[in-house]
Curated annotation (Swiss-Prot):
The gene is nell2.L. This is Protein kinase C-binding protein NELL2. Residues 53-226 form the Laminin G-like domain. One of its GO terms (cellular component) is extracellular space. Pfam families: EGF_3, EGF_CA, Laminin_G_2, VWC. Homotrimer. Keywords: Calcium, Disulfide bond, EGF-like domain, Glycoprotein, Metal-binding, Repeat, Secreted, Signal. Residues 1-19 form the signal peptide. It is found in: Secreted.
Length: 814
């Protein structure tokens, strides 16, 4: 999508109209914020390109021009999450110097760095992209020529424009920058750090302008009326945000419709179901001696507190069936005893005759005694009852005739009546034991749980639960559990288990690191280039690397692992290789790995030959020949860069003083200068390996290695060279690929084609291709969203392909 959007921006932005002013609040004056002045070590205030601002000479290498933490943070606050800004500087760089103008980096991550190489005559912009990858844009240009230049590089989303001396030199489509710099990020001026990238020359007006087309502050006559790519990206982003809102709203509406459909078919009022009875929300009822209320679908009960009723004459408090508290009931007084309504009394005369009385309307009335059934037990086991003239046998089941024992109260037969008693573990709520409640032995201290246990109350009893790390001996006691001995611990397989009181500790074995439950092998020197530490000080290296720490690249070319086509040369890369077409050949566009797609260049047909006018160019496989027509006396001269070079003439290239060319019978032959280190006048710029001075040595970026002048090495996908004490690094050249989806494998530097778009991290985005997500919402290419119904599944639309993956860090944070 970046590529398509960038093309749109380039086509859309036709420059026309007049310039506008610049808001000073959007300008970051680096020199002013760093408070550079005469007292700053390593720099000297000098005459600049103009007199309106200070200019500084950067010459000494014993300098440390770095913004303080507070000043750097103030600058970063203006830059964070910005995708539209311009770096401007007016400078006069010493010839052949390779130095950093401005560097914003954290550890090894360069968020924004601008450097100019006088060794390779190019300007480089290093930045961190939105995909969190390091990117480098190289612009061939001689900036280090000891002349004044006004330089600006404007970034607008994926659109980059470079102006030098108010002339547009380059315009490119790039990946969007990522300027969310973390705390602790450093800002350096005129150097990368304390030992590398020293700029030599004069700088003036070093600024960052956080606005569209900020180059206008340096070159006010340039036009800036056109909307920028960032404007367009912002519009697309808003569309994507609205699209996401639409998707979420649609999902909510769908869920609401489903719920409404279910609501139409059911009664949704909350209720409580207790003992087969249904009670509505907030409805109250009596359950024995407890008052209950249905609250939020749950029955909540509390024990009633009964107060003695104040009864009138002829009434007395008594329990009523189905009621917890006593109520006033009518009474009768008979033979000095009090009887309640319906209560009976059997009276025996001296002759043994039984008369039955019953309390009715405050009066004991004689009633007819029912006929007594014959008893099937001996006379000695007959039991006389107070409320009946009929006797019963000993052991008669009074409970079966009815009782008022409720809940946790049970009925018990006595010799002449039935009574209620509470079950074990319960206590009476009233004196007749008709209602009982559970005794909480734990809170009342009526349990027998011993040390290392926790008392848990249960209905009618309690239980003793062992504390963590202990095992049960019996119902009331526990003993310490050795999880280590029983292999019931949580230690990693590479950890040692130590038993403790009530638990255990895990400690990683020597050679492993972690918290004990998760131990990982530790390699003292680390595993480089994507290697994995699989055992103490043992690295498993990815393909293409070897060594104890995977520090050595396998040269597939010299080791004979690769056989390139005869028309190609094998070029080694970190972790990989490619077959590059030899001089005289070019790729036909198929970009085959082994060089089979290399084909001959017809120098004669394309005009890329050096034959003079008196000879005839004849194409050869991988080259050409200048042939003299039969019977004609040819000079053998050559044509080079529009000039005639005589046969046998030798010259040095104008833009490369280290290359020597010669004309040999119409053919121009160029080679690097032969270095004779014994010659005291040898050019040390072209032959740095002949420089024996210690001051010409270079320190490796890690600070652990020293290189001699002329040495080369590869560091972070860059080819580096030590040249007279200065380190200059440039991106490794990658073979061209032609595919829709590609990926840069870990520890490698160049992209490879892949067929699965979900594996790709580099995509030729096509804005016309869309995806339909799980809620049937159309998504643009490049958009991302959290999958419906999940919290940690991120989905992306990649050229019509929907790719979803789970974020492990998100899962850990849930």
């Amino acid at each position: 999508m970046e590529f398509i959007l960038g093309i749109f921006c380039v086509l859309f932005c036709l420059r026309a109209g007049a310039g506008f002013g610049v808001d000073p609040s959007l300008q970051i004056d680096i020199f002013e914020d760093l408070q550079l002045g005469e007292a700053t070590p390593g720099v000297q205030q000098v005459q600049g390109f103009h007199n309106r601002s200070k200019a500084f000479l950067f010459q000494d290498t014993s300098r440390s021009i770095k913004a303080s933490t507070e000043n750097a943070e103030r600058i970063f606050q203006k830059l964070r999450n910005k995708h539209e800004f311009t770096i401007l500087v007016t400078l006069k760089q010493a010839m052949l110097n390779s130095g950093v103008i401005l560097s914003i980096h954290h550890s090894d991550h360069r968020y924004l760095e601008l450097e100019s190489s006088g060794h390779r005559n190019e300007v480089r912009l290093h930045y961190r992209s939105g995909s969190h990858r390091s990117q480098t844009e190289v612009f061939p240009y001689i900036l280090a020529d000891d002349k004044w230049h006004r330089f600006s590089i404007a970034i607008s989303a994926s659109h980059l424009v470079l102006h030098i001396d108010c002339n547009k030199i380059y315009e490119r489509i790039v990946e969007k920058t990522f300027m969310d710099v973390p705390p602790g990020t450093a800002l350096w001026v005129g150097q990368r750090n304390n030992v590398h990238g020293y700029f030599k020359g004069i700088m003036q007006d070093l600024q960052i302008v956080v606005m569209p087309q900020g180059f206008i502050s340096q070159c006010p006559d340039l036009n800036r009326t056109c909307p920028t790519c960032n404007d367009f990206h912002g519009l697309v982003q808003k569309i994507m945000e609205l699209q996401d809102i639409l998707a979420k709203t649609s999902a909510k509406l769908s869920r609401a419709e489903q719920r409404m459909n279910r609501l139409d078919q059911c009664y949704c009022e909350r209720s409580c179901t207790v003992k087969g009875n249904i009670y509505r929300e907030l409805e109250s009822w009596m359950d024995g001696c407890k008052k209950c209320t249905c609250t939020n679908g749950t029955a909540q009960c509390e024990t009633l507190t009964c107060s003695a009723p104040n009864c009138l004459s002829g009434f007395s408090p008594a329990y009523v069936p189905g009621k917890c508290c006593k109520e006033c009931q009518t009474v009768c007084v008979f033979q000095g005893q009090m009887y309640f309504e319906e209560e009976r009394e059997a009276v025996y005369s001296s002759s043994g005759q039984c008369v039955l009385f019953q309390c009715k309307d405050n009066t004991m009335r004689r009633i007819e005694s029912p006929e007594c059934l014959p008893l099937n037990c001996p006379q000695s086991q007959h039991i006389t009852l107070r409320n009946s003239c009929c006797k019963v046998c000993k052991g008669h089941d009074f409970c079966s005739e009815g009782h008022n024992c409720m809940g946790y109260s049970i009925c018990k037969n006595l010799d002449d009546k039935a009574v209620c008693i509470c079950r074990d573990g319960f206590r009476a709520l009233r004196e007749d034991n008709a209602y009982c409640e559970d005794i909480d032995e734990c809170t009342e201290g009526r349990h027998y749980c011993r040390e290392n246990t926790v008392c848990v109350n249960t209905p009618g009893s309690f239980m003793c639960v062992c504390q963590t790390g202990y095992l049960k001996i019996d119902d009331y006691s526990c003993t310490e559990h050795n999880e280590c001995a029983t292999n019931q611990h949580s230690c990693d397989e590479n950890a040692m288990c130590f038993n403790t009181v009530g638990g255990h500790n895990c400690v990683c074995q020597p050679g492993y690191t972690g918290n004990g439950t998760d131990c990982r092998a530790f390699c003292k020197d680390g595993c480089r280039n994507g290697g994995t530490c699989i055992a103490p000080n043992i690295c498993a290296c990815p393909q293409g690397f070897t060594g104890p720490s995977c520090e050595s690249d396998i040269d597939e070319c010299t080791e004979g692992f690769v056989q390139c086509d005869s028309r190609a040369n094998c070029i080694n890369l970190p972790g990989w290789y490619h077959c590059e077409c030899r001089d005289g050949y070019h790729d036909n566009g198929m970009f085959s790995l082994g060089g089979e797609s290399c084909e001959d260049i017809d120098e004669c047909a394309t005009g890329r030959h050096s034959c003079s006018n008196d000879t005839v160019c004849f194409n050869l496989d991988g080259g050409f020949d200048c042939r003299c027509p039969h019977g004609k006396n040819c000079s053998g001269d050559c044509t080079h860069e529009g000039k005639i070079k005589h046969n046998g003439q030798i010259w040095v290239l104008e833009n490369d003083r280290c290359s020597v060319c010669s004309c040999q019978v119409g053919l121009v032959m160029c080679r690097r200068m032969v270095c004779d280190c014994e010659n005291p006048t040898v050019d040390l710029f072209c032959c740095p390996e002949c420089d024996p001075r210690l001051s010409s040595q270079c320190l490796h970026q890690s600070g652990e290695l020293t290189y001699k002048s002329g040495d080369t090495w590869v560091q972070n996908c860059q080819q580096c060279r030590c040249l007279q004490g200065e380190v200059d690094c440039w991106p490794l050249p990658c073979p061209a690929i032609d595919c829709e989806f590609s990926v840069v494998p870990e520890s490698e530097c160049c992209p490879r084609c892949v067929s699965d778009p979900c594996q790709a991290d580099i995509i030729r985005n096509d804005i016309t291709k869309t995806c339909v997500d799980e809620t049937n919402v159309v998504r643009f290419t490049g958009s991302s969203w959290i999958k419906h119904g999940t919290e940690c599944t991120l989905c992306q639309c990649k050229n019509g392909h929907m790719c979803c993956s789970v974020d492990p860090q998100c899962l850990q944070e849930l």
